[in-house]
Amino acid sequence: MNAALNLWKDAHAKRLSQYCAVRVIGRVSAVRRILLECRIPSAKVGDLCEVSKADGSLLLAEIVGFTQECTLLSALGPPDGIQVGAPIRPLGVAHRIGVDDSLLGCVLDGFGRPLMGDCLGAFAGPEDRRTTLPVIADALPPTQRPRITRALPTGIRAIDSAILLGEGQRVGLFAGAGCGKTTLMAELARNMDCDVIVFGLIGERGRELREFLDHELDETLRRRSVLVCATSDRSSMERARAAFTATAIAEAFRARGQKVLLLLDSLTRFARAQREIGIASGEPLGRGGLPPSVYTLLPRLVERAGMSENGSITALYTVLIEQDSMNDPVADEVRSLLDGHIVLSRKLAERGHYPAIDVSASISRILSNVTGRKHQRANNRLRQLLAAYKQVEMLLRLGEYQAGADPVTDCAVQLNEAINAFLRQDLREPVPLQETLDRLLQLTSQLPE
């Protein structure tokens, strides 16, 4: 009885400590693009506020900074209808979400609010009674991250043979527009062994979102998935926040001991949204025309995925590259942060070679942790054959290649069609890992020692 009474007292003491008898209200003094200037006493960076529009509707905004004279708020939606003198009510809480099994099958906006159906959503207001967690949070300490040791087959021969992934790995999918990255991402979601799938679709066209829901996700997959969507017409704040919302949802399921697959499309559009926010906030432009906040937030985002003592988040981040160049500043930065990368080739896509994975340019930094010596040796031989063929490809097209000079190159030319047939694969036809390994060993055994 005493224990129950103490719990009741503690709960009500916590609620009373958050209660303020004086209603604090600020006023908008200036509107600069997505930034609002006002004065709010005792405000903290990260706190949410409600801004009243001229028509009586409310706009959420977040405190992002201060000057000597005013508080700076970033509007979480279009600031249309905001006028000077509009009242601002600080909510006294940061952006938080509540996560439970009721979220499975839901489609949410960038802040965690429901977009369709009767889903409650994840967004937690100040009166929310659920157990909540912050959307913007720190990653787990390195000492609390177990080593990646378990393979996570994808059912795709081109990946499982040369870039076999591990549970808890963070991988980048680098591709130009039209190379099939979204289709490949959906195929990975269908094939990979996981308990929960969290999709983060950032800056996508609205039409593509509906097509993705209807054609790529069947009912079984939908029942164990959560989709966080911020289409290209949404505010830059929502597009940038969607990546953190999806990651926070994945973290909540991982804390419950589940294996989570996080698919974020794309980090490039996240960086572009953050660039808009940085420029509006007055940040100077740095390398690649990006403000410093982009390079600060990218590692804060991707480091939150990975293994924990309870569960795991295996993360796949797509990155758009222009003209198939890996020297794009976002691509270059992301490649240095992740545990591996898969590169899609436009040349292969134009030939009808799908999935258009350039095995030679793709790599997994934890491959040795999840494969045996035979697999590693066969993988090295496959790459050797692909590299040897690439060196003489132009000579073959011109009819100038002379066989007999190098036995490795001769073998690469003879096996080229067989290798391409091995790396091609139709959709919705997953191949068991052992079958992939057997075919890989058979192919590469013909390479002379």
UniProtKB/Swiss-Prot annotation:
GO terms for molecular function: ATP binding; ATP hydrolysis activity; protein-exporting ATPase activity; proton-transporting ATP synthase activity, rotational mechanism. It holds the Pfam family ATP-synt_ab_N. InterPro entries: AAA+_ATPase (IPR003593), ATPase_a/bsu_AS (IPR020003), ATPase_alpha/beta_chains (IPR050053), ATPase_F1/V1/A1_a/bsu_N (IPR004100), ATPase_F1/V1/A1_a/bsu_nucl-bd (IPR000194), ATPase_T3SS_FliI/YscN (IPR005714), P-loop_NTPase (IPR027417), Rhodanese-like_dom (IPR001763). It is an enzyme of class 7 (translocase). The keyword Translocase applies. Keywords: ATP-binding, Cytoplasm, Nucleotide-binding, Protein transport, Translocase, Transport, Virulence. It is found in: Cytoplasm. The keyword Cytoplasm applies. It comes from the Bacteria. PANTHER family: ATP SYNTHASE, SPI-1 TYPE 3 SECRETION SYSTEM ATPASE. ATPase component of the type III secretion system (T3SS), also called injectisome, which is used to inject bacterial effector proteins into eukaryotic host cells. Acts as a molecular motor to provide the energy that is required for the export of proteins. Required for type III secretion apparatus (T3SA) formation, proper protein secretion, host cell invasion and virulence. May play a critical role in T3SS substrate recognition, disassembly of the effector/chaperone complex and unfolding of the effector in an ATP-dependent manner prior to secretion. Belongs to the ATPase alpha/beta chains family. T3SS ATPase subfamily. The core secretion machinery of the T3SS is composed of approximately 20 different proteins, including cytoplasmic components, a base, an export apparatus and a needle. This subunit is part of the cytosolic complex. Forms homododecamers. This is Type 3 secretion system ATPase. The gene is sctN.
